Amino acid sequence: MLKRIQYILLLATLMLGGAAYAGDLEPTMGEDGIYHYDWYHQSFLELEDDITEALDEGKILMVKFDQVGCLYCEKLALETLAEPAINAYVREHFVVVQLDLYGNRDVTDLDGEILPENEMARKWGVLFTPTIYFIGKSTDATTLPQASNATMPGSFGKPTFFGFLQWVREGNYDGGEPFQKYLVRRMDEIRSEMEAARAASS
């Protein structure tokens, strides 16, 4: 019941948000050739600080690898994250840091090592995009993958992606219900939430 009340409040926010919310549904192509949303975290890429900031806000850090020409990355940006229910849920519960698999911005890992994005990706063993790490609690780990409570390897369909976000948000990665069982049990509810959010934002 509590989750249902929270979702009704979310829909009310969508309806009251109007034009401002509509703008949050459209990513822009950056000079790097990758789609970005304005609400992505403007990070110095010092990941320990990003984790602390997310947790202080009561949110989960989401570190997402993209690359130029990745069709699945574009689908995630243009379709999945533009889905009203998913878009609102991510902005409410997650802090998103976007990295480029072949980029050259300096990233500071949890052990203090500073490497360009492309070298950090190799250090972490990131081979394809999108790859998304979720960090939802404090950690003594020395690398981001070690700190990650859950990892999304690749691009999921909209309902599965939304379900995974909710599964992570509820802390099921920490000995809770396995994701596949969670998804099967809640798929009808997830689809209904998506339909309601579309109606509220139209």
Residue map of PLM features:
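Bacterial N-terminal signal peptides that target proteins for export
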Residues: 1-8
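N-terminal "domain-start" segment that seeds a small globular fold
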Residues: 23-51
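Short active-site neighborhood of thiol/selenol oxidoreductases, capturing the structured segment around
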Residues: 56-71, 96
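Bacterial N-terminal signal peptides
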Residues: 8-17
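Detector for the c-type heme attachment site
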Residues: 74-78
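Non-catalytic, surface beta->alpha helical segment in thiol-disulfide oxidoreductase systems
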Residues: 122-176
